Amino acid sequence: MAYGIVHNFPGGTKEQYEASIAAVHPSDGGLPEGQLFHAAGPSADGWTIVAVHESQESWERFRDETLMPTMPGIEGGLPTPPQETTFPVHNQQTG
């Protein structure tokens, strides 16, 4: 079952996001293995990222093996761990 993740970074900026995404996503501009969707943009209090992975296990593997170990060392990246909301995806549609 697909698995959704919403990350909110209070005080986060576009520049911090771009530095962070360059470090944790493939250099060819694609998505990490198992990720189906990624969107990001400014929110009322900072920066918000929405992702959908093909499964909870896919998300946890990316989080534990790539995202969390890499984030603290990214120069100019998002400086704090996100506020996280996760959910099993009940309905996923694309245009």
Locations of regions flagged by a protein language model:
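Short S/T/G/P-rich N-terminal loop/turn motif that feeds into the first structured element of a domain
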Residues: M1-V50, E54-P69, E75-G95
